[in-house]
Amino acid sequence: MLRDLFVKKKKYAAIPSEQVRKDVPDGVMTKCPECKKIMYTKELLKNLKVCVNCGYHHPMNAWERLDSILDEGSFREYDKEMVSLNPLEFPGYEEKLESDRKKTELNEAVVTGEGTIDDMLVVVAVMDSRFRMGSMGSVVGEKIARAVEKAYDLQVPFIIFTASGGARMQEGILSLMQMAKTSVALKKHSNAGGLFISVMTHPTTGGVSASFASLGDYNLAEPGALIGFAGRRVIEQTVREKLPEDFQTAEFLLDHGQLDAVVHRDDMRESLRKILEVHQGGGMAVWQS
């Protein structure tokens, strides 16, 4: 009818078609989970995966971490071929391991080896949370223990970057015993005067936080890293108290004397270099045969 010509029409927003969305290839853009800013992935990578807007530290994989701290071309990997089995015949475990191997191109949740920082030799271990959430099973514990023993033999410092959900439940008591094994290896290294630097990244929890991650001569962490043993909700239900908002963050632990420093990723290599420089002498303050 004629009156319909004068009725105010509703305004509609144009929704991009699926074809338009597909014009932007996967991986080109990254959204920061903290400030929600969308940025070019290449810009994020150039900034060591730190958000250019809010400073949020995005997770790094093992190889990105090694590239950010070691001299170029200096890394030599240890025990690359070690892989986990399924000793307890846990249902579905082998399939999950194989899936993570394909997804990450890693054989396990930790990469160990030796390299140099400003020409100073170190043994280093880097955990990768993409593989079984960085959980510690038999192979992870064995690789870390072997790396510590190598540092002992070479009389050089040992550095570890942790990122883990804790002990691996599919391996039961075999995973829990890795807490003791790695701690004993570090004690031997320490008794000989060996330097151990632990750098805790997001997240470092469970059996990893309760063992080797907290045993450093220097305990460092990245900003905002979640560090703790049990989960926040479990603790609140146990103590029946409301915990502070920043509870179990790196900054909270620093304020309460459980960390030596919270170090921005941009400053990590230089901070490690300064510590190593202070402890020159093969990494051993007092070497005891």
Curated annotation (Swiss-Prot):
GN (gene name): accD
Superkingdom to which the source organism belongs: Bacteria
InterPro entries cross-referenced by the UniProt entry: AcCoA_carboxyl_beta (IPR034733), Acetyl_CoA_COase_Trfase_b_su (IPR000438), ClpP/crotonase-like_dom_sf (IPR029045), COA_CT_N (IPR011762), Znf-ACC (IPR041010)
Protein name: Acetyl-coenzyme A carboxylase carboxyl transferase subunit beta
EC numbers on record: 2.1.3.15
Record's cofactor remark: Binds 1 zinc ion per subunit.
Classification lineage: Bacteria, Bacillati, Bacillota, Bacilli, Bacillales
A GO MF label: acetyl-CoA carboxylase activity
Subcellular location: Cytoplasm
Family note: Belongs to the AccD/PCCB family.
Primary location group: cytoplasm
Quaternary data: Acetyl-CoA carboxylase is a heterohexamer composed of biotin carboxyl carrier protein (AccB), biotin carboxylase (AccC) and two subunits each of ACCase subunit alpha (AccA) and ACCase subunit beta (AccD).
Keyword Hydrolase carried by entry: no
GO BP terms, alphabetized: fatty acid biosynthetic process; malonyl-CoA biosynthetic process
Pfam family, any one: Carboxyl_trans
Pathway field: Lipid metabolism; malonyl-CoA biosynthesis; malonyl-CoA from acetyl-CoA: step 1/1
A Gene Ontology term for the protein's cellular component: acetyl-CoA carboxylase complex
Function field: Component of the acetyl coenzyme A carboxylase (ACC) complex. Biotin carboxylase (BC) catalyzes the carboxylation of biotin on its carrier protein (BCCP) and then the CO(2) group is transferred by the transcarboxylase to acetyl-CoA to form malonyl-CoA.
Domain CoA carboxyltransferase N-terminal: start-end pairs: 28-289
Cofactor(s) it depends on: Zn(2+)
Organism, as annotated: Bacillus cereus (strain G9842)
Zinc finger intervals, C4-type: 32-54
